[in-house]
Amino acid sequence: MGYDVSRFQGDVDEDLICPICSGVLEEPVQAPHCEHAFCNACITQWFSQQQTCPVDRSVVTVAHLRPVPRIMRNMLSKLQITCDNAVFGCTTIVRLDNLMSHLSDCEHNPKRPVTCEQGCGLEMPKDEVPNHNCIKHLRSVVQQQQIRIGELEKTAAESKHQLSEQKRDIQLLKAYMRAIRSANPNLQNLEETIEYNEILEWVNSLQPARVTRWGGMISTPDAVLQAVIKRSLVESGCPASIVNEIIENAHERNWPQGLATLETRQMNRRYYENYVAKRIPGKQAVVVMACENQHMGEDMVLEPGLVMIFAHGVEEI
């Protein structure tokens, strides 16, 4: 529906009047053949009854409608109109194209969002403030939270039960696999080959790395840092069969003899450049896999590999 003509300052050109509602055009559209203009809502409602132009009865449908010319839109935008909230005391007169932005900030707008200043902080339409009850609102919030907590507790209990069942199934599956392997040695060899190929595929997917500051090595990473590195290993595609073992080898207590203490590391530092290292994506850390470092002595590598974490100095080659 169009704007009430009485809200506008001065005379309004008759070309800007909707023939259906007799108001000033709101969201105007035009029938292209006869060039008659209508409010979008008015003509849409009209077409629900008949498919003709309301003015000259020529055949026209919703699909035929087009936006009105720019000159007409400019004429509409320049009209001066009173605020929708004039009945509530607003005396502002604005250009039609600024009406919506004014309404959103108009202090007389009964639907303007306001925040309760009595303590609950609820945002509500201004006209609902007189009937607002903080205690009632907060009670509703608490009840909703209790319902949500109950749902989360139920979900957590179900997840815990499912996890317990899955752990039991995994143990049964492991026992079954052990029985099969013991009965068929060839199957065990095949499984080991598949696992080795999976490890090689993952290692080859990582970027070669160079360590420029071996002195920045963190040989005793805490549990939090190890968890961060482990997450990156998993995200990089590290096979599940070795990820835990590799991350355990991120601490010097599990390192081979040649890396076990600061003294031995300093003695063997000249050999570090011979390592084939791969960068753990996004981290100042490398993985040194035994399958790529068979040229190193047994006192410098671990099966299946080890992780070295640094404060800085890890670069991709």
UniProtKB/Swiss-Prot annotation:
Gene3D superfamilies reported in the protein's UniProt record: Zinc/RING finger domain, C3HC4 (zinc finger)
* Coiled-coil region: 135-175
> What's the EC number here?
2.3.2.27
Keywords, sorted A to Z:
Coiled coil, Metal-binding, Transferase, Ubl conjugation pathway, Zinc, Zinc-finger
Q: Does the keyword DNA damage apply?
A: no
Catalytic activity reads: S-ubiquitinyl-[E2 ubiquitin-conjugating enzyme]-L-cysteine + [acceptor protein]-L-lysine = [E2 ubiquitin-conjugating enzyme]-L-cysteine + N(6)-ubiquitinyl-[acceptor protein]-L-lysine
Q: What class of enzyme is it?
A: transferase
Q: In which pathway does it act?
A: Protein modification; protein ubiquitination
Q: Which GO terms describe its biological process?
A: extrinsic apoptotic signaling pathway; protein polyubiquitination; regulation of canonical NF-kappaB signal transduction
Protein name in UniProt: E3 ubiquitin-protein ligase NRDP1
Ranked from the top, the taxonomy reads: Eukaryota, Metazoa, Chordata, Craniata, Vertebrata
